[in-house]
A protein has these predicted regions:
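C-terminal motif of bacterial Sec signal peptides marking the signal peptidase cleavage site
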Residues: 17-20
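Amphipathic alpha-helical segments
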Residues: 49-64
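Bacterial N-terminal signal peptides that target proteins for export
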Residues: 1-10
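Bacterial signal peptide processing site
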Residues: 22-25
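A short, solvent-exposed beta-edge/loop patch
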Residues: 28-41, 124-180
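Short, conserved charged micro-motifs
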Residues: 49, 110-114, 156-161
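A short acidic-to-branched-hydrophobic micro-motif
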Residues: 94-114
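Secretory pathway targeting signatures of secreted, lumenal, and periplasmic proteins
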Residues: 60, 65-99
Length: 180
């Protein structure tokens, strides 16, 4: 009797498992958004204005600002990851892969401040820190409705211009400091 119940129970379990893989299962393929390469085809006026401010801040250092040619997406907090972005690159002769500056856009200045605080807090957590070298230096600046994010590390940034970019960006808008 117990053998029949066990056999019937096993058949019911198998039927449920197979039913879950059948018609009721989702056929949609889960995809992820592509990584950012340079600014979007249509960049807003706020992002263009922030780009102009960044270029002006870098000009005295004789560092040019270009559209990024390679995909780049740094570690981001959820609010920042969901925001529209444009990626630019400060041209560094000794570090052609470095100098990426990301400009995120938000609906208003308050939302940009909230996102800046969230990003700074995120970078202070284990989940945020593990995505960067131990000696990473972050620059987070709110400029109007945009948020500017730049990171560099002495251990991985061979160009002497890397810290100068951070210093130049520190002259823009309002800053946020991640906890150490």
């Amino acid at each position: 009797m117990i053998g029949r119940l066990a056999g019937a129970g096993g058949a019911v379990v198998l039927a449920i498992l197979f039913a879950g893989c059948g018609i009721g299962a989702s056929h949609e393929i889960v995809t992820f958004p592509p990584t950012s390469v340079g600014p979007a085809a249509t960049v807003s006026a706020a992002v263009l204005q922030t780009r102009a401010l960044i270029a002006a801040a870098l000009a005295p250092l004789q560092i040019q600002l270009a559209d990024a040619k390679d995909p780049f997406r740094p570690g981001e907090s959820p609010r920042v990851a969901a925001a529209p972005r444009a990626v630019y690159q400060a041209v560094l002769p000794a570090d052609p892969q470095g100098g990426q500056i990301v400009v995120y856009e938000f609906r208003d200045a308050g939302a940009a401040v909230d996102a800046g605080n969230e990003l700074a807090g995120y970078l202070g957590t284990g989940a945020g820190r593990i995505q960067f070298p131990d000696d990473a230096r972050w620059t987070i600046r709110q400029v109007g409705t945009t948020l500017v994010f730049y990171t560099w590390a002495p251990s991985t940034s061979p160009d002497p211009g890397s810290p100068k970019i951070a210093d130049a960006l520190a002259t823009l808008g309002i800053g946020f400091t991640p906890p150490r």
